[in-house]
């Protein structure tokens, strides 16, 4: 309605969000608040890579709360959920029942700094390359090689965080100045 559009400062080209509630009702909003960044994910029988991809997709998509449900969640599914949450920066499992796991991102978007994360990736990767060569030249370089593998997981976590930050920039249309 025109009065609503005028009241909310909406003009041609403005972004308007449409959200569907649990009861099917649609709500219009000019900003996407934190409460709109919740998703329900029915995983049915998914495990392994398929489940991990779904969770990473929700994370990178900027969802702050991911409610994972299944008729009866298997121990393998719960193990996969715990493993992926441990590989992400910010999310934690806040609730776990026989058929539901609630994952919430506890990292404030104001704390996100892409430039620092990119510098950290650069530093870690440079040291990984150096240590990889050192482990090859060293007769007992297995311990150093295992450390390189661990740091690769850290780089993966930072990469996913940066991907999430870019999604946030696209969603909000703004960049926080550091």
Segments the model singles out, each with a brief description of its role:
Residues 3-16, 20-178:
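Cytosolic, long alpha-helical scaffolding segments
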């Amino acid at each position: 309605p025109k009065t609503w559009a005028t009241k909310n400062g909406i003009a041609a080209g403005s972004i308007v969000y449409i959200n569907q509630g649990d009861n099917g009702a649609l709500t219009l909003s000019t900003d996407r608040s934190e409460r709109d960044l919740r998703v329900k994910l029915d995983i049915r029988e998914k495990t392994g890579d398929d489940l991990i991809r779904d969770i990473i997709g929700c994370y990178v998509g900027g969802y702050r709360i991911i409610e994972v449900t299944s008729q009866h969640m298997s121990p393998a599914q719960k193990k996969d959920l715990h493993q992926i949450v441990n590989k992400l920066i910010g999310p934690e499992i806040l609730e776990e029942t026989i058929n539901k796991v609630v994952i919430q991102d506890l990292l404030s978007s104001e704390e996100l700094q892409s430039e620092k994360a990119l510098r950290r990736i650069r530093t870690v990767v440079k040291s990984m390359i150096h240590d990889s060569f050192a482990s090859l030249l060293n007769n007992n370089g297995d311990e150093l090689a295992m450390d390189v593998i661990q740091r690769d997981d850290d780089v993966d976590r930072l990469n996913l965080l940066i991907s999430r930050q870019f999604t946030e920039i696209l969603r909000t249309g703004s960049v926080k100045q550091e």
